[in-house]
């Protein structure tokens, strides 16, 4: 059975307690919490969510191909917070746009960053989102091959479909062994909207996950923090509710 949750970027005006309570009431009990460092204004409650296994992922903006000490320091800070709060995963990105080549310099930076993270000896694991440079399953596999390492994956289906230009089945076949979380959102490739109101093949996605017996995390990534014109979080929940029965 899949586990439902949402990202706190969908409710930037709510504190964690409000978000957790509303998510629990609405059938989306798990939270993906975005952080920027080890200081969090609700650290005690974040620890409670981690201990209750209601927060499994902290979201950072760290780009794995970035070569800058301050970004590695930020990653260490966020991962330390995750470890202190019993949160198993820290989300990372690619670090540059999909149109840029994944060249030897970026491959070397990625390997160095992953080696650095391993040297910290923290219990927390990195999890890669299909985002920016790695907005396709093919690119993700190139990263794994070039670094000699694999990572758990958040499959942002919107990015692989619109930016990576892969069909849902193509991305699934490439990433199936690594996916532990599926991000859901809708739009037309440029502008976002409520799930079911855009041109993303939502029905096809749910049918694919049903066929493959997917039983991981399902996260509503309603990007209201970045797109304040979007409806509020409750409307996003109601929109996804129309599809949940397919699983």
Which functions belong to the PLM regions below?
Residues 67-70, 103, 136-139, 146-147:
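Intrinsic-disorder/low-complexity, polar/charged segments
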Residues 103-139:
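Hydrophobic, well-structured mid-protein blocks that either form specific transmembrane helices
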Residues 9-10, 36, 69, 108, ...:
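Residue-level marker of alpha-helix boundaries and capping positions
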Residues 1-27, 46-53, 77-87, 112, ...:
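Histidine-acidic metal/acid-base catalytic patches
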Residues 66, 105, 131, 193, ...:
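Short, surface-exposed alpha-helical recognition segments that flank or form part
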């Amino acid at each position: 059975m899949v586990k439902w949750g949402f990202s706190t970027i969908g409710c930037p005006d709510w504190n964690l307690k409000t978000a957790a309570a509303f998510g629990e009431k609405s059938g989306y009990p798990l939270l993906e919490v975005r952080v920027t460092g080890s200081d969090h204004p609700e650290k005690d409650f974040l620890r409670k969510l981690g201990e209750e296994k209601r927060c499994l992922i902290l979201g950072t903006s760290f780009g794995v191909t970035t070569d800058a000490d301050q970004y590695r320091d930020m990653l260490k800070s966020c991962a330390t917070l995750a470890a202190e709060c019993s949160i198993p995963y820290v989300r990372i990105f690619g670090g540059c746009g999909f149109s840029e080549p994944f060249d030897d310099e970026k491959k070397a930076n990625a390997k160095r960053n992953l080696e650095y993270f391993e040297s910290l000896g923290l219990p927390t694991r990195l999890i890669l989102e299909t985002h920016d440079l790695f907005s396709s399953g093919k690119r993700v596999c190139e990263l794994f091959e070039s670094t000699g390492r694999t990572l758990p994956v958040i499959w942002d289906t919107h990015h692989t479909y619109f930016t990576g230009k892969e069909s849902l089945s193509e991305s699934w076949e490439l990433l199936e062994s690594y996916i532990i979380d599926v991000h859901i959102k809708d739009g037309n490739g440029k502008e976002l909207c409520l799930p079911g109101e855009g041109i993303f093949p939502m029905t096809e996605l749910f049918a694919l996950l049903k066929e493959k017996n997917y039983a991981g995390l399902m996260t509503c990534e309603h990007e209201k923090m970045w797109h304040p014109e979007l409806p509020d979080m409750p409307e996003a929940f109601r929109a996804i509710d129309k599809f949940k029965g397919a699983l």
